[in-house]
Swiss-Prot record:
UniProt keyword list: Ribonucleoprotein, Ribosomal protein, RNA-binding, rRNA-binding
PROSITE patterns the record matches: RIBOSOMAL_L22
Quaternary structure, from the entry: Part of the 50S ribosomal subunit.
Species of origin: Exiguobacterium sibiricum (strain DSM 17290 / CCUG 55495 / CIP 109462 / JCM 13490 / 255-15)
Chain's role: This protein binds specifically to 23S rRNA; its binding is stimulated by other ribosomal proteins, e.g. L4, L17, and L20. It is important during the early stages of 50S assembly. It makes multiple contacts with different domains of the 23S rRNA in the assembled 50S subunit and ribosome. The globular domain of the protein is located near the polypeptide exit tunnel on the outside of the subunit, while an extended beta-hairpin is found that lines the wall of the exit tunnel in the center of the 70S ribosome.
UniProt KW RNA-binding keyword: yes
Stated name of the protein: Large ribosomal subunit protein uL22
HAMAP family noted in UniProt: Ribosomal_uL22_B (MF_01331_B)
SUPFAM superfamilies, per database record: Ribosomal protein L22
GO BP term (any one): translation
Gene name in the database record: rplV
Record InterPro entries: Ribosomal_uL22 (IPR001063), Ribosomal_uL22_bac/chlpt-type (IPR005727), Ribosomal_uL22_bac/org-type (IPR047867), Ribosomal_uL22_CS (IPR018260), Ribosomal_uL22_sf (IPR036394)
Length: 110
């Protein structure tokens, strides 16, 4: 049985979020949470929140045992990009891309 959780339209670049998600893929829940507790990245609180949501879904919706849960899938997809402009010298403007991410985590019993 699998339990899923996701966060869509999160305002962080997918490349940065993938660095954190790659650390917890395939790990047991306790180990994944301890890794996230000591990871100093901007995406860590977002990934931790999604992981805790997947754990809560597994416990509440499917009556799974938390001690046996493993992160089976963890991936980040690219969301829509917000385009902004920054004024530059001589009346020009340059574009700034504010990227968004969709974070997905799937946990299951081993």
């Amino acid at each position: 049985m699998q339990s899923k959780a996701s966060a869509n339209m999160v305002r962080i670049a997918p490349r940065k979020a993938r660095l954190v998600v790659d650390l917890i893929r395939g790990k047991q829940i306790g180990e994944a949470l301890s890794i996230l507790a000591y990871t100093n990245k901007a995406a860590t609180p977002i990934v931790e929140k999604v992981l805790k949501s997947a754990i809560a879904n597994a416990e509440h919706n499917f009556d799974m045992n938390i001690e046996n849960l493993v992160v089976t899938e963890a991936y980040v997809n690219e969301g829509p990009t917000l385009k902004r402009f920054r004024p530059r010298a001589m009346g020009r403007a340059s574009r700034i891309n504010k990227r968004t991410s969709h974070v997905h985590i799937v946990v299951s019993e081993k």
